[in-house]
Amino acid sequence: MKRASFIDIGTNTALLLIADLDPVNNSIIPVLHRQTIVRLGKNVDEQKIIDHVAMQRLIQCLLDFKELSKEHKAERIVAAGTSALRDAKNRMEIIDEVVMASGIVIKTLSGEEEAALTFTGAIAGMENAPERFTVIDIGGGSTEISMGDMACLDQSVSLDIGSVRLTERLFSDQPPSETEFYAAKEEIDRMFTGNLEPFFAGREHVFGVAGTLTTIAKLVSGQKEFDPAKIHNYPLHYNQVRQLLEELKSLTIEQIIGRGVPEGRADVITMGTLILHQFMRLLGVQEITVSIQGLRYGMALKELQQLQGENSNIL
């Protein structure tokens, strides 16, 4: 048994999973989950640079995660960066600064690597899995869609459709004007066009991961406090997403915060919900099963496979 920490550094949020890896029973046993809204990707879509203030937020977050890892006796810390680090021209400078300040080495994942790890993470430990299914991860900077079965990932794509990226690009305020909202709808449709056809075969069983999906599930279910046990495997219906979108597009940030959305997500959840709505509408998806798993679990599985001395047939 080995205990390790896995950190997913996204455009908006950094997430920590501390888990026990059991190579004998091929299992991942979660010990601790944490997340911090860092907004590393603030203005990266326009400037292609991660600024000093965002970097300092990330460093402080990683120092906190490192302390938690130490408290829980994790033997190793594995950290991966996604869309914001992929896009930033000063990526290596940021990574070097982080190493010097925290001792944590960040690997920047390609979109394809992110999609594959998210797919394997989302299905980790799944019982009675459908024959074929699709996984969607709507992040702050990009959206990853992947399809396959429990044995193999068949198809994946990473698109620059993210809640932070498109909010900065297309909304001047919250609530957005009617013109901005419908322009965003058309832009998302344009970006999805030509990329969704391969996933029609897996549209009957779709799993959604990451903060946008879990926040939407929390809002739809009416939970006052986020309870991972109640969110995991929550069935999210298209009509519920459509109704929530109608509500969110007319609310101020303060009103959205009043609904229980964290301050660092309240300004981008309308766009995140719009992205999900258009994905479901264009692909003809009637229901999505929300999972609290994802990239961190995929990273943990990869570490577990290395412990076993095996190579995954997916990664």
Please tell me what each predicted stretch does.
Residues G141-M147:
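Acidic, divalent-metal-coordinating active-site segment for phosphoryl/phosphodiester hydrolysis
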Residues T11, G140, G211-T214:
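Short, glycine/acidic-enriched loop or turn micro-motifs at the edges of active sites
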Residues L15-L17, R39, V78-A79:
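Short, conserved beta-strand segments within well-ordered enzyme catalytic domains
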Residues A4, I18, N43-A74, T82-R132, ...:
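Helical "lid/coupling" subdomains associated with nucleotide-phosphate turnover
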